[in-house]
Amino acid sequence: MTKVADLSHIRELMKKRKERANEFNSIKHVDLQDNGTRNSPIKQFLLQKAWKYVIIAAWFVASLFFFGYLLNRGNTDLTKEMSPASLPVICVRENGHDFNRMFGYTTEMDYSVIRDGITPLQTGRKLNVRVYKMGEKINNISYELRSIDKERFVEEGDVTTYTQTSEYMDLSFTFKDIISEKTDYSLKIILTLENDRKAYYYARIFEDDTLNFSEKLDYVYYFNDCTFDKETAQDEIGKYMESNSSGDNTNFSHVNIHSSMDQVTWGSLEVKRVDEPVCTVGEIDSKNALMKLEYTVSALTGEEERLYSVTEYYRFIKGSDRMYLLSFDRYMNTILYADKGVVYKDKLMLGIMPSDFEHAESKDGNTYAFVNNNALFVVNSEQNTFGTAYSFYDKDNDDDRCLNPDHDIKIVSIDESGNVIFYTYGYFNRGDYEGKCGIHLFEYNSKTNVVEEKLFIECDKPYEIIKEDLEKLAYANLLGEFYFYFDQKIYKANIAEQQIETIVENLNNENLYVCANNSMCAWVSKEDSIGVLQMTFLRMDTSERYTIDAKGGERIKALGFMGEDLIYGDAKIDDIYENVYGEKIVPMYNLNIINKFKEILKKYSEENIYVTGCRINDNLITLMRDTKDENGSLVSAPPDSIVNSLMEKTYKNNSEVIATENLKKIVQVTLKREMDNKKIKFKTPKTEMYEGKREVLLNTDSENIFYAYSLNECLGEFTDLSKAIKTADENYGTVIDCDGHYAWKKETYASTNQIMKIVETSEINDDTSSLERCIETILEYEGFSLDVKKNLSEGMNPGDIIEKNVPYSKGLDLKNSSSDEIKYYLNKDIPVIAMAGDNTVLVVGYSDKVYVWLNPRSGNLMKVNVDEAETFYENNGYHFVTYMKWDS
C-alpha cells in the first residue's frame, strides 16, 4: 500500500510538470511578428502576472497605511505635547512700576517660608496690585491676611471694586489698622477661574513709612534705562560705578560695579529690551535696599537675532543727597532653541552664558546633553540629531510664565542608546502640573523621540527650599528607585509602586556626605558627646548599604568623597577636644580611603602627624595637619596632599570659552564628531502619558531649621543658627525659621540703644550662679518671675528655659557669632547673655564706643569699652544666648 501511494504521488507531480511545460511551449511557438502588441500572448501573460503583483503590492501598502493609522491613533492617546500656561500673573504696583511678580499655585503652599520678595505697604496700609489675565476669565477674587506663621488670622474678604481692561485688572487693598508696624504678614490672593479652578498667590507684606520706597524703586528702574543709552549713562550713572582693573570687560555673561562704562552699556552689542523689567524687593529699611531686576533683551549678531534673559542685582543706600551704589551685578544668559543657529559642523555655539553649566555624555560620547536657561538639550552626533528634550518655553510659548526661572533640571545618566534619565524640580510653569511645586523624574528615549514620565513628587515648599535639599542628593538607579534628600531625611521612591519610604530621618545636612555623581552617600548613624561611633554607607546604584564602626577607645570622622571613594579618619578619644569657640576638633592619626565595595584602597598615616581637615578638589586631596610638641600640645604642621591619578576623567565632547568680536567671550562645545549641517534633524519630543496618575504627595514637617536668604534666593539650610547668620551677614541677607519668623536680619541699626527697663539689681549670693541671675533678669523683663536653679540642674539649657516661659519666643544659642551680629537683638530691645562661665554677663545696650552690661554678681550696670568687650567675647568663644520674638 505504501508503494502504490508513492507511485500515485509521483504521477501527480509529473502531470503538473507536463502542464507547466505545455504552457511555456505555447509561448515559444508564438508568431513574433506581433511585436508585443496588445494581443501578444507574452504580453497577456506578463500583464496577468504583473497585475497579480500590483494587487498584492497595493494590498501590502494599504495594510501599512491602515496599521500605521491604528498605531498613530494609539500614540495620540499615549503621547501629547505640553499644554500651554493657563494661570494669570499678579504684580504689585508702585508709581507706575510693576514689582514683586507673583505666579499662581494650583495647590495651597506652606507660605510661611515663601519669600518671593517683601512688599512695603503704601501710606494708610494700602496695597495696589495688577492682575494680568493672560486670556483667562476670572470669576472671583478674594484674599486672606494672616501672621507669617499662619497661626493668627487678621482679615479676609472678596474684592468687588476694581478697574479693568481686556488685558488686566487693577485692584486696591486697604488693610485694617490692627496690623503692627514693621511686622511681616502673609497675604494670600485667591483667583477663581473657569470650571471653579482656583489659583493662589502669596505675598509677604509689612507697614513701614520710613523706607522712601518709591524713590528707591525709581532709582533702579532709571539706572537700568540709562544702560541702554551710552551718552546719558556717562552723566547719570557713571558716578555710581567703581570701574577699575578688577572688572572683567571681556565677558557679557557677568558685569559688575567694577566693569567699564562701555561694558555696562552693552559694548558694541545691538541690544534692545523686548519686555519691561520687573523688580523684586529683597531687603529694605530706611537706608538700605537690595533689589533685583529681571527682563529679556534681543541682540543682533550678523544676520541672526538671539534672545537673552538678564538679571540685575542692586545693593545701595540712600544718603542725605543721593543714592550710593554698594554693589551691582548683571547676569546675561542665551535663550537657546534647537535650531541651525547653534550647530556648525563639530561645534555647538551656545553663546553668552555661564561657563559652569549642567552637562553629561554617554560612555561612547555619541550623545551629549546639556542644560541652558532651565531647558534640556540633547545632541547625537552619530545620528545627526539635535533636540529640546524638556523645556517650558519654546517659540510658541515665550511669555513671562514660560520663562519663569524657578526650576532646575539635573541629568542623572545617559546610556549607550542615547536615552537620558533626568529630573526637574521646583515650580512647574505649564503642563499637567502647572502651578505645583515638586520633583519630576523622566526618561528621554532618543529612538522614539518621546519623554516618558516616571514619577511626580508634589510638595508644599517653594522652589528655593526644594533646590537647597535636592542639590545635596538626588539619584535614580536602574532598579526603578529614586533617592533624594529633603527636610533632613533621605527618601527612596519606588517608581513602579508609586510609594515613598524614609531611609533615614533627623539627618543634619552637615552629617551627610555625597559623591560627585550622587550614586554613593554616607551619613553619621551613631554618635555620642565625644564623637562619631558609626557611619552608614549607601550605594544607591544597587541599594546596598553597610556600616563603618569606630574601634574601641576611638571615634571616626568622614571628610568627604573623592570620586566614588569615601575618605574617613580614625582618632583617639584622648586627642579629641573643643576649642574656645565650641567647635569639636578631631585630630586623626590615620586616614582611610575606601571604595564602594568597602575595600580599603589607601591608608595614610605618619608618625606624630594628625589630620584635622582636608580640601578635596577633583583628584587632589590637600590635608591640614597638626603635630604634638614636647608638651603634648597640638601645633600646626605643613600640609600634605594625596593625588588619585586613576580618577582623571576625559570627555569626548568638550566645552570651552572662546573670544568673539561682538559677543566677546562665549561658550562653545566641540563635539566628538562633525555633524552634517544640511541633514541635521531637529527634534521636539512629546511626553508619554499613562492611565492613572504617576503622582505622589510628600508630607513635610520641618523643625529646628533655619533658612538664610538674600533677595528671594535661599543661601542655605542650617540647624546651626550661628552659621546661618554668618552666611546671611556676608550676603546682606536674612535668616528665618521654619515658621517664617525672623531669626536675624542684616539691617541698619540705631547708632546707640539701651534697654532701659533692665535696671540694677542686688548682688547675688554664693548659691546663685551668674547665668541664673541673667536668665531670671530676662524673665523679669518679659513679665515673669521664676527661680531657674531647678531648670538648670535638670539639664535645661538657657535658651530652652527662656522659650518655655516667654510666649511667642524661641531661645537661641549662638556660638562664634560676632559682636556686630548680636546688635540685631539689642536693637530690638532683646537682651543677650554673653556666656563666660562664672563671669557670664547680660548685654543690654551698645554704642559706637561702649557696650552696656549688667554684672550679675554685683547687680550693677557697667559701661565697657568696645575693645575690652571684644576681647572678653573672643576669649569666651563669642558664645551668646538670646531669643527671638514675634507678635501673638
Please describe what each predicted stretch is.
Residues 435-449, 535-541, 583-598:
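Beta-propeller blade signature
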Residues 185, 283-297, 418-424, 566-571, ...:
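A short hydrophobic beta-strand element
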Residues 41-60:
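N-terminal Sec-pathway targeting helices
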Residues 59, 71-75, 112-128, 140-166, ...:
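Surface-exposed, charged secondary-structure patches
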Residues 155-157, 328, 386-395, 450-459, ...:
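Beta-propeller fold detector
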